[in-house]
Structures are given as C-alpha cells and as structure tokens.
UniProtKB/Swiss-Prot annotation:
Requisite cofactors: [2Fe-2S] cluster; [4Fe-4S] cluster
Keywords for the protein's UniProt record, in alphabetical order: 2Fe-2S, 4Fe-4S, Cell inner membrane, Cell membrane, Iron, Iron-sulfur, Membrane, Metal-binding, NAD, Quinone, Translocase, Ubiquinone
Identification of the protein by name: NADH-quinone oxidoreductase chain 3
Occurrences of domain 4Fe-4S His(Cys)3-ligated-type (ranges): 90-129
2Fe-2S ferredoxin-type domain mapped to chain residues: 5-90
Residue span, 4Fe-4S Mo/W bis-MGD-type domain: 227-283
InterPro entries membership: 2Fe-2S_ferredoxin-like_sf, 2Fe-2S_ferredoxin-type, Mopterin_OxRdtase, Mopterin_OxRdtase_4Fe-4S_dom, NADH_UbQ_OxRdtase_75kDa_su_CS, NADH_UbQ_OxRdtase_ferredoxin, NADH_UbQ_OxRdtase_Gsu, NADH_UbQ_OxRdtase_Gsu_4Fe4S-bd
Binding site for [2Fe-2S] cluster: 37, 48, 51, 66
Main location: membrane
The enzyme's E.C. designation: 7.1.1.-
Biological process annotations from GO: ATP synthesis coupled electron transport
Species per Swiss-Prot/TrEMBL record: Paracoccus denitrificans
C-alpha cells in the first residue's frame, strides 16, 4: 500500500490511501455522499454528477468525487492537508441542480412503481433536491425493452446511470446491453432487442437506483414495508451465498442478496433469486402410506408407526440428499447406524475420501481467487456449477490472472488455455516440472464434481492434489450440493459409496435424495418437501425446505453458515430433524435431544469445527496415495443449470428458463433452399 496521506473532509482529518477516490475517503470518514452511477464493485462512469464535492483551492467548480483520486488533490497552504467540503453552499446548489436535471424526464410513477419505498431517487430527492421544478416542457417517453422473463423494464424512468451496462459487461461477461445516442436521445438498450442470456442477470434489478429495471415475477405483489425480512443462506449451489428472504404471511415473495465479501460479494444467481415460485408448488403437505398399490393420506402417528414397523429388525440404508442441513444429516446417521444400518451422502457417486477434509473440501478459500495469478480448472464448468464463483474468476482474469481448463471447451465468459479434455491432460499437468518462479506466484486448483464422480474419481482427485502440491497452489473442491460438505463432516458416509450402502438393504430411508434411482426391491421411506422423483414409494413424510427450518450448511470451502427459518411448511409438514426425532421415539431408540438447540450441542460435540460459524477452518494436508487414471474425457456435473433440485424442478419459471437455454444451444435450422 502507498504511504497514507492526510486530508481534511469538512471538519474531520483522516489518513487514507492516495489511490482512493474522494467518495471512498468520505465513506471512511463516515460522511455520506449521494450517488447514482457509482458502485464500488463496478468501474467508474462519472455520469450522474450527483456526488459533487467542493475541492478547496482547486478549480472554482465542484468535482465528481467518484472520479477524482486523493493523490490528485493539491496540498493546502504551508503543507496543510488537502481539504474537501461536502456540505458547502456550492455543493448544496450543485446537487439541487443535478437533481432537477435528473427529474426533468422522470415520470411521477411512484404510486405504481415497484421500487417505491426502497428507491434511491426518492430518498435523494427528499434529502438533496428542492420541492419544485421549473421544467414545463413535455417529458421524454421511450419504449420498454423485452429482456426476458426475469427483468421487467420501464425505460421512461431510466436516468442513464449505466450500472446495468457495466454489470452485464464486467461481471456477467455478456455484451448484450449498451447505451446508444447522445444527449436527450441517449438510451439504454439491448443488442438487436435480444433477451439477456446470463444466469446472473437478475442482479441488475438490485443495481438499478430507480424503477427502470424491476423483477418481473415479483411485480405488483407487495410493498417493501409489508414484508418480513429474514437473513439466511442459499442452497441452490454449494457456494452458500448470503441472502435475504422476504415473506408476506406464509409465502416467500422474493429473495435478495446480502453482502458477504468472502463468499458472494453482493451477487446471486438467477436460480437463487427466482426459484421461490417452486416453494409453492408440488408441495408435500401431509403423510402418505401406500396400500394396495396406491398412496393414501395418513396422520402423523399412523405414518410414523408404519415407518417404525417397516424398519424394525431390517437391514437399513439411509440416503442423504443435496439440500439436507447438517443437523438432519447427523440425526439420520445416529438413527440408522444405531439400528445397524449404513448411511451415505455421496448420492451422485462422487469419490470423496471420508475423513480427509483437505481432499473433500481443499485448502483454499473462495476469496483466494481474487489474488490468484493462475487458476486451473479440472472437470468443472463454474458458469453452471457456481455462477457467482465464476464471476469471481472472471474478475481475477480481468486483472491479469491466467486460467486453464481441463475438460470440454465451454463459454466461461473469459479466455482460458484449453489444456485438454481427458485424463491424459490431467496426468500431463500433474507430472510437469514447475519452476520456482511459478511456484512463488499465488495460484489455485479447482476440481469439479463431474471429474470425481466416475470409477477413477479418487485417482483424478489424487492427481489434482499432486498438481496443487507441486505448484504450491491452493486446492478448492467445487461441490454442487449445498448439504454435501456438512454431511461429510458428520461422517454420513459408507466405505464403497452409494452401491455399498444400499447393497442388500431391505429398507431405504431416503432423506431428500430425489436423484437416486432405487430398485423396486427394498421398502422405501421418503422424507422431503416436494412431490418429486423420490415421492412415489411406500411411505412419504412431508419435511420442510430450506426457507422453512433453521439449519447449518457448510459451503464448498468448508465455511459453516446458518440458514434461518423465514416461513412455515405448508399443511402438516414438519422440520426434518423433528421428524427423525419422533421416529426414533417410535422405534424405541429415542434420540437424546428434544430441541434444535439440544441437537446442535450434540452435533458440535461430535464435530467441533461446526461451532465456528462463518469461519473457514484450516485443513491439514493429507495427500492421497497413487491411483491409476482411466482414459475417459471429463464430463461436467450439471447438464441443466435451472433444474438441479426438487425446488427448481417445481418452479414454472425455472422450467421456462431451462427451455429457453436449450433453444439457444440447439443448432439453428438450415435456410430453406
């Protein structure tokens, strides 16, 4: 960092990095400067002029604080600190003038605008504007854009801050939005009126400081002050993005991102943001028992008694799905293993070694990507498996990092060196001599689940670890299941994996593992939230989904985080841990807790690092032995980004987005001859 420099802001003297902009220095001093175009995670545009400040001793006009750096300030007389003023008469008059210009063409839509109540323009007009307008001419009107089923546009409200253009170009990595024209004819538009193709496009809704870009599914459904806001964690991928769930009564109305620099910064994927309509459809709201080949509704005592009767004295296997919190995984493990059964969470066949956290989690943090100069991807397509992580890799690439890929070539929104598609390319990488100069540069190896889900998965992982060790790189295992690391941590694994767990089982207790095909032989008890693939067996117990119960999730870097309950399960649905606790009592093996707090105490006793909420534990490096690689090419873990779990498959909007994505990938029809 450069030597700090003293500056005086109003009556406060602070020391700041001279490379900081004036608006950043003001924030450090605790002084709020209004802004519309400036955003700390986007490039500087300097086109709204709302952030004007007075530079004492500088030009006799206000300066844009977002575009001027501290090092450009002139020192005061006799070496005194440079001085800027944010509340002088000059600044006040300038802000009033800028606000008047911004409101010239802005319609009086506040009563019918979805941004009302959380609108930057409303707030800043009240704080810095005047209560009248001198403008008497007709206002400009523009046609709205069709950006697709997610973002609704009202372009007459647009103030041309260009945040949406900069986000789509710089963060999302698409070039479909831009600004055309000059002066009053300038407008934000999409290229050839195309709909947006990014799976992160919903973030422009949050970035828009006015009501020009709003959520199409949420439109006209609620006002901000009607909503109950709950801070929670996303489970649509294994990144564990920080989110806020807004509810009205029993319904989830929308999902928004929360800032977390170490995980998702302030972005979320479109699946995270818009999957909430799947929480309302195809829900299991009562227990069912199969009799004479047909499912019939049952009471809870009846269903639990039938489940206990089926399990007593039988060989049991427990399967743990992708969205199961650590508490429920721990509870099922205790229940099934107490009855002499086996439990398995690696239901996709991933060859993750039990007990070796450096191999099934890695040693790197997500934020290590920011400083990496070299990033090697092995068998992963992060654009589909973790879109927000992919945006972070793109940010590192834009700063000069080099990216390599072993796997099928795909569009990752940034350039990369394609090393190869098969195991031979990985073997060549892991056995290559690496110079000391290269080892000294920060680097990271990222391994996808598709790379380790085949028979030689452990060999792939061993070679990836060898590459990381040889190059002094951090290792990050990119999971696709939000509950996988937590279940691995509690030891919900069987030697030999899924096939070994269900081999010879007479009863299978399926806890939300809808993607597993179970033969017709064993008696199957399904516990889950949606009427998906798994809910067609012998006994069905309706559980809560991630917004309806508090739970502990461990993300792909090994960071324990708490998801909080925002609403209640429909009908007779119950929290997953509570169902297992009640079933244990019915089996005569009552689990030693009667509350979630009691369960967590036992969980932390067994796995102490789970008590370190929002901390990433250091994992001791334990290299794997030598394994022989196969010959196959790498296949990615996710084929359809929008339909990866029961909640997403129940969402009509996710189905529409999936169909649109498939249509874009389909070959164009040949021209008629």
């Amino acid at each position: 960092m450069a030597d700090l420099r003293k500056i005086k802001i109003d009556d406060t003297i602070i020391e700041v990095d001279p490379n900081m902009t004036l608006i950043q220095a003001c924030e450090m001093a605790g002084i709020e400067v209004p802004r519309f175009c400036y955003h700390e995670r986007l490039s500087i545009a300097g086109n709204c002029r709302m952030c004007l400040v007075e530079v004492v001793g500088g030009p006799p006009k206000p300066a844009a604080s977002c575009a001027m750096q501290v090092k450009d300030l002139r020192p005061g007389p006799e070496g005194a600190p440079s001085e800027i003023r944010t509340n002088s008469p000059m600044v006040k008059k300038a802000r009033e003038g800028v606000m008047e210009f911004l409101l010239i063409n802005h319609p009086l839509d506040c009563p019918i605008c979805d941004q009302g109540g959380e609108c930057d323009l409303q707030d800043q007009a009240m704080a810095y504007g005047v209560d009248f307008s001198r403008y008497r001419e007709p206002k400009r009107a523009t046609e709205d854009l069709n950006l697709g089923p997610l973002v609704e546009t009202h372009m007459t409200r647009c103030i041309s801050c260009t945040r949406c253009v900069r986000f789509t170009t710089e963060v999302a990595g698409i070039t479909q939005m831009g600004q055309t024209g000059r002066g009053e004819d300038s407008e934000i538009t999409s290229y050839l009126n195309q709909t947006l193709e990014s799976n992160m496009q919903g973030n422009i809704i949050d970035l828009c400081p006015v009501g020009a870009l709003v959520s199409k599914p949420y439109a006209f459904t609620a006002r901000p002050w009607e909503l109950t806001k709950t801070e929670s964690i996303d489970v649509m991928d294994a990144l564990g993005s920080s989110i806020r769930i807004d509810t009205k009564g029993r319904e989830v109305m929308r999902i928004l991102p929360r800032n977390h620099d170490g995980v998702n910064e302030e972005w979320i994927s479109d699946k995270t943001r818009f999957v909430w309509d799947g929480l309302r459809r195809q829900r299991l709201d009562r227990p069912y028992i199969r009799e004479n080949g047909r499912l019939r509704p049952a009471s809870w005592p009846e269903a639990l008694e039938a489940a206990a009767r089926a399990m007593k004295g039988k060989k049991i296997a427990g399967l743990i799905g992708d969205l199961v919190p650590a508490e429920a995984a721990f509870s099922l493990k205790q229940l099934v293993e107490g009855l002499g059964g086996k439990v398995e969470c690696r239901v996709d066949g991933a060859r993750l070694p039990a007990g070796n956290r450096s191999a099934y989690v890695g040693t790197a943090r997500i934020e290590d990507i920011d400083d990496a100069e070299m990033i090697q991807l092995i068998g992963t397509n992060p654009r589909d498996e973790a879109p927000v992580l992919n945006a972070r890799i793109r940010k590192a690439w834009s700063k000069g990092a080099k990216v390599g890929l072993v796997g099928e070539p795909v569009d990752l929104t940034y350039d990369y060196a394609h090393v190869g598609t098969d195991r031979a390319a990985l073997e060549s990488l892991s056995s290559r001599e690496i110079s000391d100069e290269t080892k000294a540069r920060p680097s990271i190896v990222i391994v996808g689940q598709g790379a380790i889900a085949r028979r030689d998965g452990e060999a792939v992982l061993a070679h990836a670890m060898k590459l990381a060790e040889n190059s002094n790189s951090g290792l990050l295992i990119l999971h696709t299941a939000a509950g996988r690391v937590g279940a691995m941590d509690v030891g919900a694994v069987t030697e030999g994996g899924l096939l070994a767990a269900i081999d010879g089982a007479e009863v299978v207790y399926n806890l939300g593992a809808d993607e597993v095909d179970i033969d017709q032989g064993p008696f199957v008890i399904y516990q889950g939230s949606h009427g998906d693939r798994g809910a067609h067996r012998d006994i069905i117990l309706p559980g809560a989904c991630y917004t309806e119960e508090s739970g502990l999730f461990v993300n792909t870097e090994g960071r324990p985080q708490l998801a909080m309950r925002a609403n209640f399960a429909p009908g007779e649905g119950k929290e997953n841990w509570a169902i297992l606790r009640a079933l244990s009592a019915e089996l005569g093996a009552t689990q030693p807790w009667d509350s979630l707090a009691g369960l967590r105490r036992k969980l932390v006793e067994a796995v102490p690092h789970l008590a370190q909420i929002d901390q990433v534990p250091q994992n001791e490096w334990q290299p794997l032995g030598r394994f022989d690689l196969g010959q196959a090419s790498f296949r990615y873990a996710i084929r359809d980004f929008y339909l990866t779990n029961p909640i997403a498959r129940s969402s009509p909007l996710m189905g529409e987005l999936s169909a649109m994505a498939a249509a874009r990938k389909a070959p164009a029809p040949l021209a008629a001859e």
